[in-house]
């Protein structure tokens, strides 16, 4: 039977869906719905009815409604505050589904929200304009009776209630929500206040409230009906987030197949209960194991304490390598007593901790690292000066000063073993390769009886001059382990000293890591690119290196991770740098600085023939006959295809030639030999990029050749000057010049202007002309005062229109009074003049002593003209006077 009615409706969010015949409550946020319920003054008659329409979002202008709503009997409505806004909590009993699609017309927002006059007022209050909804409602009592008959015939439903009761009792684990929305948590609350805030109920309170409402609303004797309504109420409490199947139950709810619905929920509950049982069992087992572990550890602690009183130590595992070493009379001397005590204490501390504790893992890692370090273990030196000299000569040509220093150190070691009476008492042999040096890790420096005078070197020179490979050769010559530590870009002090163990992911610094990697405390350490360390807010790593490189301090090096001193006094540290000026002064004061010269042409030829060519042949698996290169061709390659201080570029050129020959051999299997000559060189390498005879500039006014020095070695510097009229006059500088070089140009101009008559500049108006000074290769930054005399010469040449001979170059700082001050990098600048085939070089008189460090091969090709004042240069270049003093080498 169907009855047409005019009904009020309220809009509720879709995540608060409920089921027919159950009790529930919802939070009403939509303002029109609130105004509707306020007209009832929250007092409902028994025959009052409403419709709940579900919407995805009640705040948007175009509300999208679900096709299925609920026909309800309102029980109570109270005002609450929700997120600072007024809201209503509506308590109701759901009577039936309300299918919007069965209405006599299609439901849409415009029609529903339009005002319809309430003719059948089914709620108390003033008759007026309210939201209404028209449709057909099935006879609720008939549907309920049919469902109850189905329940009476199926006794299995009673078993379902016991299952569902278990689910309710475990609501925290399975999908029953006690605060699904703020309103749901306030289910059946009796005392509301206008300012009440929403509070969640626990599941026992909800069960009690549901039972009380069912008892009030139904005949208590109807036990089956009570259970049925309680079941449908529980359905409404299923949390959509934990039980997404609730949405399917709501949409597919079919009165004709209610048994299927119950079975689906029952299956879910049984699966959830089984899963919960398994999880609970695993947790219980884990907790039992932890409790068992705790009890055993406590017992072990008491036993260990008692054994300790008897002088017995049971904290160590016999399978531990460290324990085996302690039982060995020789190996136990490897560890200082203080370290053994720390390991023992930390091991005991670890044994008393729960292994699941985060701190336990930190303590374990710390102890393992202490055991891993070599401490007093060192490798035996090969005390053979002849062998060491052969190895050093094998890998490097030249570099006499470094080789001599290493041989001196080897001589000291031999002398110590021969004449020091205490030496044998301080060293315990392990095997033919390793020994224990008891002179390490002395508690007091005064206790030391053997001093090895271990060198700490700093090799400074251009790239490609063999600094890095030299350290490898030294380690092989002395039979020591080799460790490379790259310092380029390091800007955090903790990378050197390590991190404190309080930090997450703490680890030792690069130095201690290197010692652990080497496995001995007397390795050769290469500190590569020490001049490229940086500093920031995290500290200055160069300051940390002071302790490493100071022979007076490195016996007590402090690493933050170890929190113990480590003796680095037996380690040979070899630092490398490209530019002397970039090394902190404090570090320079602590090391022996050995400058490596750029290689001369003859040295490059020797290096190529003895080292590079054999290496290239081996790398590409060629026969020597297929890589036949005469010395003439090799010299041509060095002069015309490379321009460098070292030999890295030469190595790449030779690699390229070798690959070309390999291709020829693959294409011509019968090829037995191949000669690399000047005739086929262009075919193999292309056009030569450098043409030394044609590199000199044309002799035109305004150009002078200077000499410069950078991290890559020496280079020539052609300075150009041009003059043009302007209103303000002055000087214009281009070519990426830095401050010192700009000041040098300003000084040169001031000096020329103040001595204009002496230089033959009579009619030039400095105030109406701009002097533009340019230094080519503008992309390369340039700095330094040594171009002062070159600036002066170029300015005078431009203003007098007298050219400077292109076989002259110069270097020197100039003052406002014309004095020529000393400069640095004379050796590198001489190399640049040599490559440029410049015959005469002006140098400051104070730099004469530096000529001794320049290789004879270079000096023989250059005539040096030392000067004290600039006018000496002027007289030679512009007045054709012969120099009073020249220095030549035959």
UniProtKB/Swiss-Prot annotation:
Induction: By heat shock.
Entry keyword annotation includes Protease: yes
Record: active site: 786, 829
Protein's job: ATP-dependent serine protease that mediates the selective degradation of mutant and abnormal proteins as well as certain short-lived regulatory proteins. Required for cellular homeostasis and for survival from DNA damage and developmental changes induced by stress. Degrades polypeptides processively to yield small peptide fragments that are 5 to 10 amino acids long. Binds to DNA in a double-stranded, site-specific manner.
EC top class, as a word: hydrolase
The organism of origin for this protein: Mycoplasmopsis synoviae (strain 53)
Any Gene Ontology biological process: proteolysis
EC number(s) per entry: 3.4.21.53
Keywords from the UniProt entry: ATP-binding, Cytoplasm, Hydrolase, Nucleotide-binding, Protease, Serine protease, Stress response
Lon proteolytic domain residues: 698-880
Binding residue positions for ATP: 461-468
Annotated protein name in UniProt: Lon protease
């Amino acid at each position: 039977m169907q009855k047409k009615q005019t009904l009020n409706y309220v809009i509720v969010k879709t995540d608060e869906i409920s089921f027919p015949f159950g009790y529930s409550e919802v939070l009403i946020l939509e303002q029109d719905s609130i105004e509707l319920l306020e007209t009832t003054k929250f007092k409902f008659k028994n025959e009052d009815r409403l419709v709940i329409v579900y919407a995805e979002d009640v705040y948007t202008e175009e509300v999208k409604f679900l096709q299925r709503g609920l026909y309800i009997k309102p029980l109570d409505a109270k005002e609450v505050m929700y997120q600072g806004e007024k809201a209503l909590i509506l308590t109701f009993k759901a009577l039936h589904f309300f299918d919007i699609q069965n209405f006599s017309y299609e439901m849409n927002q415009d029609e529903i929200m339009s005002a319809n006059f309430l003719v059948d007022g089914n709620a108390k209050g003033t008759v007026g304009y309210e939201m209404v909804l028209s449709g057909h409602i099935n006879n609720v009592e008939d549907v309920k009776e049919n469902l109850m008959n189905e329940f009476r015939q199926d006794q299995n439903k009673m078993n379902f209630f016991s299952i569902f009761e278990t689910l309710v009792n475990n609501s925290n684990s399975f999908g029953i929500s006690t605060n699904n929305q703020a309103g749901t948590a306030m289910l059946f609350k009796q005392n509301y206040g206008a300012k009440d805030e929403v509070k969640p109920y626990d599941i026992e309170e909800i069960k009690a409230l549901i039972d009380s409402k069912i008892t009030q609303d139904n005949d208590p004797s109807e036990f089956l009906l009570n259970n049925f309504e309680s079941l449908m109420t529980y359905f409404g409490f299923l949390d959509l987030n934990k039980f997404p199947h609730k949405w399917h139950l709501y949409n597919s709810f079919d009165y004709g197949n209610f048994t299927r619905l119950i079975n689906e929920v029952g299956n879910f509950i049984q699966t959830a209960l089984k899963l919960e049982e398994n999880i609970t069992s695993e947790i219980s087992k884990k907790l039992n194991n932890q409790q068992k572990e705790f009890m055993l550890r406590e017992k072990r602690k008491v036993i260990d304490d008692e054994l300790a009183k008897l002088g017995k130590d049971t904290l160590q595992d016999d399978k531990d390598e460290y324990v085996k070493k302690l039982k060995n009379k020789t190996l136990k001397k490897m560890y200082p007593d203080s370290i053994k005590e720390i390991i023992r204490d930390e091991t005991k501390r670890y044994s008393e901790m729960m292994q699941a504790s985060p701190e336990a893992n930190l303590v374990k890692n710390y102890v393992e690292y202490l055991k891993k370090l070599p401490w007093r273990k060192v490798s035996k030196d090969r005390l053979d000066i002849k062998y060491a000299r052969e190895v050093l000569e094998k890998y490097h040509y030249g570099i006499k000063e470094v080789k001599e220093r290493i041989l001196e150190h080897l001589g000291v070691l031999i002398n110590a073993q021969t004449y020091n009476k205490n030496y044998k008492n301080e060293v315990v042999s392990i095997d033919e390769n390793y020994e224990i040096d008891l002179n390490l890790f002395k508690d007091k420096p005064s206790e030391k009886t053997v001093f090895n005078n271990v060198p700490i070197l700093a090799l400074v020179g251009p790239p490609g001059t063999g600094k890095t490979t030299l350290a490898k050769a030294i380690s092989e010559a002395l039979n020591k382990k080799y460790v490379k530590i790259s310092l380029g870009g390091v800007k955090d002090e903790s990378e050197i000293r390590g991190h404190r163990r309080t930090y997450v992911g703490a680890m030792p610094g690069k130095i201690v890591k290197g010692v652990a990697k080497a496995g001995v405390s007397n390795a050769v350490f290469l500190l590569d690119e020490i001049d490229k360390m940086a500093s920031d807010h995290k500290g200055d790593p160069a300051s940390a290196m002071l302790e490493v490189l100071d022979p007076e301090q490195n016996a007590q090096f402090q690493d933050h991770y170890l929190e113990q001193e480590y003796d680095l006094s037996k380690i040979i540290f070899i630092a490398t740098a490209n530019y002397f000026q970039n090394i902190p002064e404090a570090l320079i004061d602590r090391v022996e600085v050995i400058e490596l010269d750029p290689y001369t042409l003859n040295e490059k030829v020797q290096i190529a023939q003895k080292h590079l060519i054999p290496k290239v042949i081996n790398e590409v698996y060629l026969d020597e006959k297929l890589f036949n290169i005469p010395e003439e061709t090799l010299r041509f390659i060095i002069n015309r295809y490379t321009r460098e201080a070292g030999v890295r570029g030469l190595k790449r050129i030779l690699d390229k030639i070798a690959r070309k020959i390999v291709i020829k051999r693959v294409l011509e299997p019968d090829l037995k030999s191949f000669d690399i000559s000047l005739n086929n060189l262009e075919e193999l390498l292309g056009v030569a990029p450098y043409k030394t005879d044609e590199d000199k500039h044309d002799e035109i006014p305004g150009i002078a050749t200077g000499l410069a020095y950078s991290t890559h070695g020496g280079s020539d510097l052609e300075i150009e000057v041009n003059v043009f009229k302007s209103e303000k006059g002055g000087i214009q500088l281009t070519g990426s010049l830095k401050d010192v070089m700009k000041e040098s140009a300003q000084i040169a101009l001031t000096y020329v202007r103040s001595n204009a008559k002496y230089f033959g500049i009579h009619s030039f108006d400095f105030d109406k002309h701009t002097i533009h000074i340019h230094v080519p290769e503008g992309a390369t930054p340039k700095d330094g005062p040594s171009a002062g005399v070159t600036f002066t010469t170029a300015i005078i040449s431009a203003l007098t229109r007298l050219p400077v001979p292109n076989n002259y170059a110069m270097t020197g700082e100039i003052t406002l009074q014309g004095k020529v001050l000393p400069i640095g990098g004379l050796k590198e600048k001489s190399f640049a003049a040599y490559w440029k085939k410049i015959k005469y070089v002006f140098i400051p008189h104070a730099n004469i002593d530096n000529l001794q460090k320049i290789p004879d091969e270079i000096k023989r090709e250059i005539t040096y003209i030392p000067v004290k004042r600039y006018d000496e240069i002027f007289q030679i270049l512009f007045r054709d006077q012969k120099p009073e003093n020249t220095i030549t080498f035959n």
